[in-house]
Structures are given as C-alpha cells and as structure tokens.
C-alpha cells in the first residue's frame, strides 16, 4: 500500500496536519494522525491547491493593473506538475504560464485557477481554448470573471468541450484578492482605500501640528507596500503645503504610484516636491473653475496633468474626478488625505475600504486633528458603518480594516 505523504500533499487545518492518501485501495480517504476520514468530495484537496493558486497570484501584486491577479496550478496524481501567475498586462496569462512550466504531459490533469479562464481574443489568445487543446479533464475555478467579455463564457466553453468544472472554491479569498479588479471592470471607477494613522484617541497630530511619527516604522513600511500595490495615491492641498511630501514608494524595486493632488483653488507651490517630474511618477492635479488659468498653463507646461471639475460648494467634485481617473485606467487609489479630504471622500461615497493604523499612545487636545473632520454627522443612525472588520498587529500598532457599509449624511 502506498502512503504518499510528501510535503506537497500535506494540508494544514486548525494547527493539525492532514495527509492525503493516494493509495487506490483507500481512494476518497485521507490520513490524519492515524485516523481515516472521508475527503468530502475532494473539498480538502481542492482548497489546498486553490490556496496555492492564490499565493501565486499574489506575486503579481502591483504589476498587473488594470488586469486581475490570477494564479493557476496544474495537478496530476495529487501532485503539482505546473504553476504560473499573470505577471503584467500584455504578457501570458496564469494558465499559459502554468502550461509552460509543466514538468510532464498535462493530459488528464486538473487545473486550479483563481479567476475564470478567458474565452475571448485580447492581447493574448483565449485561455479556455488552450485548456481544451491540452486535454485538461477538470478545472476548478475560484470565482467567475464579471468582465462582460468573459462573464461565464469561459466556463461554458469548457463545459461544452466535456471538461468537468467546479466553481466557488475559496471564493471569498479570491474575491478579496481581486477586489480592485472586480469593481473597476464593472464600474470603470477606481477602488478607493482610505488610509490613516492615529493615536488611540483618534488623533493624527498634536496640538502643535506635529505628526511625524505617530505610527511605528513597521507600520510605515507596510504603507509603502500599499503604495507599491495601488495605481494612485491621493492627498489634499493642505497635506502638500504642510508636509511637502514626495508621495513615492520607498521599497527597493517598488513602483511609484500616480500622484493625485486635490487642490480646488490651485494653491500648490510651484516648487512642491510632487511637481518634480524627474521622478518617474506622474502627477495629476484636480482643481475647479476657481483656479487661476495662467497657473494652470504654467503647470501644464511643467508636464503636470490638470483636471478641472465642476465645483461643489467650492470644492472638487470627487465623484466626477473618479469617473475621469477611471477613463485614464487608474483602477485603484490609496487615499492618504487629511481630515477635510477624508470626510469629503466619505460623504461623496467614493471610498470602498478603510485601513486605520492605531498607535498605542494618547494625544488629547480639542484642537488636535482627527482622521476625519468636516461637518460630521448629528445622529448615530447616520454614521458611516464598516463591515467585514479585521485587525492585526504590526509591531506595536494595530491595523484595522473594514469595508464601507453605507454612506454618511451631512450634518446640514
């Protein structure tokens, strides 16, 4: 009897190790600390290999925009014989890279892929066609692709070819990994993440305005990873004037995000660091008709992209701005705004996710700034609500993440 318990066939759950039994005499069973269990229709194996595909997809983080993150694993006799991920737009998809890496013939194998295989010709041929041609017998898909060009067509093509298809393995994990793509492909608007660092009592600066640094070095390093992952970074003019930031990614080999400055009256100093075009990062300034036309021309002459929106109470129309940025293929924005811009973003409904770094300190002071300012709300029933909350430690700080559940109503 063969007890095939090489590392590739271990599955960790609740701090226990499960080992899949590949002996034909015990097909459909697995071995866990001396006890035989049912596999429950291969669910355990499917989750294990889909998790592998998710991990592969993550390698492309920050490089595939506006394409999705996709990972693929080819499995034969319960062993991985090929794997791949989508690296960047215009290059082979995850399924193709998995085939290219295969160590043996793939005919009769199972493919695990985090997102439905494409069925249309774009910059690359349809992956569904290649899967059929290669003789794959079963495909396990994390989630369907909402792209109108795909939207179930890839799965249907596989089924029509007689291939067994299962959809929904680790679907929530696959969905969260591609939350940016899933919004952008449908709405053509950026996925917006509001990021802030604060004290335990919600302060982002002292009474004198000092804010560097409330959070730990480890938390700030994590923020630079976010800057590498997302397409754009957005701040208000008050942040530019107060801090004169570069708004770049400090990770070696990382990618600088597109810098987006919200400046309703075009108060930005000509010598601001974000206007330094020697950096590879592009700078966009969003303003209104209140801006000086000569200054607009001067900034455009420096290579700055100026977007003029209709104003709302003298401020940039953030909803319109998101539409314009989407047309520029900016699929995600890390909002590192001050209190006023953060409130405006929440009030306008453009924020999708909130990430708050909380430092173990108390600052106090009625005049100390908080992460969200603006007019605020009068009734708790109107307060913004978060769902799917998670938190974890980053050094001495806590990172709290949540998704916007509903929009706020202005106090007025």
Predicted regions and their residues:
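Short, compositionally biased leader-like segments
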Residues: 39-52, 156-173, 359-361
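N-terminal amphipathic/hydrophobic targeting modules at extreme N-termini
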Residues: 1-9, 19-29, 33
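Enzymes that bind and transform nitrogen-containing heteroaromatic metabolites
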Residues: 37, 44-60, 65-67, 83, ...
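Proteins enriched for Cys/Gly/acidic motifs involved in redox and nucleic-acid/cofactor modification
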Residues: 63-66, 155, 169-197
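Zn2+-dependent cytidine deaminase-like catalytic core
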Residues: 74-173, 258, 284, 289-291, ...
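N-terminal glycine-rich anion-binding loops that anchor highly charged ligand groups
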Residues: 64-78
């Amino acid at each position: 009897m063969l007890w095939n318990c090489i590392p590739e066939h271990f599955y960790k759950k609740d701090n226990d190790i499960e080992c899949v039994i590949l002996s034909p005499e015990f097909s459909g069973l697995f071995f866990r600390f001396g006890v035989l269990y049912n596999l429950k229709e291969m669910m355990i194996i499917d989750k294990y290999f889909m998790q592998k595909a998710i991990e592969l997809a993550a390698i492309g983080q920050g490089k595939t925009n506006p394409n999705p993150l996709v990972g693929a694993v080819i499995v034969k006799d319960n062993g991985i014989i090929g794997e791949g991920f989508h690296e960047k737009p215009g290059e082979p998809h995850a399924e193709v890279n998995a085939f290219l890496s295969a160590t043996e013939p793939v005919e009769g194998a199972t493919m695990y892929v985090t997102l439905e295989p494409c069925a249309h010709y774009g910059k690359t041929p349809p992956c569904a066609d290649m899967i059929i041609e290669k003789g794959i017998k079963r495909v396990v898909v994390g989630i369907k692709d909402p792209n109108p060009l795909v939207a179930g067509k890839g799965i249907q093509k596989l089924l029509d070819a007689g291939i067994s298809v299962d959809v929904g393995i680790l679907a929530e994990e696959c969905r969260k990994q591609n939350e940016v793509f899933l919004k952008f492909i449908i709405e053509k608007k950026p996925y917006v993440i509001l990021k802030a660092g604060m004290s335990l009592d919600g302060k982002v600066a002292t009474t004198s305005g000092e804010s560097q640094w409330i959070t730990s070095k480890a938390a700030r390093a994590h923020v630079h990873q976010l800057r590498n992952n997302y397409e754009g970074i957005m701040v208000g003019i008050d942040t530019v004037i107060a801090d004169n930031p570069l708004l770049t990614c400090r990770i070696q080999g990382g990618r600088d995000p597109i810098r987006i400055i919200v400046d309703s009256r075009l108060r930005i100093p000509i010598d601001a660091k974000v206007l330094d075009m020697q950096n590879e990062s592009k700078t966009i300034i969003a303003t209104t008709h209140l801006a000086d036309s000569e200054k607009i021309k001067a900034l455009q002459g420096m290579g700055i992209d100026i977007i003029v929106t209709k104003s709302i109470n003298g401020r940039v129309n953030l909803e319109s701005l998101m539409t314009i940025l989407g047309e520029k293929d900016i699929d995600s924005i890390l909002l590192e705004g001050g209190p006023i811009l953060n409130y405006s973003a929440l009030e306008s409904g453009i924020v999708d996710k909130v990430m708050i770094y909380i430092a173990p300190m108390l600052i106090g002071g009625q005049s100390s700034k908080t992460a969200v300012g603006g007019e605020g709300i009068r009734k708790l029933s109107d307060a913004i609500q978060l769902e799917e909350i998670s938190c974890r430690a980053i050094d001495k700080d806590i990172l709290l993440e949540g998704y916007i559940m509903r929009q706020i109503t202005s106090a007025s």
